[in-house]
Amino acid sequence: TLNLLIRKPDGEEWELEIEKDYYEDPGIVFENGLMDDYKSCYNKCIFCFIDQMPPNMRETLYFKDDDSRLSFLQGNYVTLTNMKDEDVERIITYKLAPINVSVHAMNPELRCKMLHNRFAGEALNKIRRFYEAGIEMNGQIVLCKGVNDGAELERSIRELADYLPYMESLSVVPVGLTKFRDGLYPLEPFTKEDAKEVLEMIHKWQKICYEKHGTHFVQASDEWYLLAEEPFPP
């Protein structure tokens, strides 16, 4: 028997008794997975795919979430820019891991530029707090040609690898570009040669990380291999 106390928005309380077997689902369905409002994104990223959506589609497709609870529950990636100290402490206290982090750049000034948020560089400090608390994380970099590639990508991989083993993985994906980019930051698609250079750098760091930590750590998305016309790794 499960005794359930429900408090409604008007203050009225219901006490329910549910009889069920130990492994049986109680049959409780919430309106949404968080039981309150989703936290929206505070950024204006230069590569945001939602800004590139076609018009006149359903409203929910245009909502930009940036909610650490969805990271834990559904695997969403978060930028950490709207995460308050109490949110960080809650994650640490209750071990709400893994936290999937949209990093994009470990250069604080560059991250501020890419996310169009003056607090984006400072938010990187939360990665260290999670690392020191033993909270597992996964990182992601959306690579933009001429912005966070080359030396900046190498810096990001190197500095994030310092957070092993709690930064468990780092994925590198090319920016997705659509025809709906009027008025947005000018970005160019990667070429075949660009993709080969990205893969060369990632493979180099995979070797370094494997020799030092026993894990390849950084992974290239399928698009890089397709664009470079190289075979997928075994």
Predicted regions: what they are:
Residues 1:
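Conserved PDZ fold ligand-binding element
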Residues 13, 22-166, 176-204:
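Conserved Radical SAM active-site core
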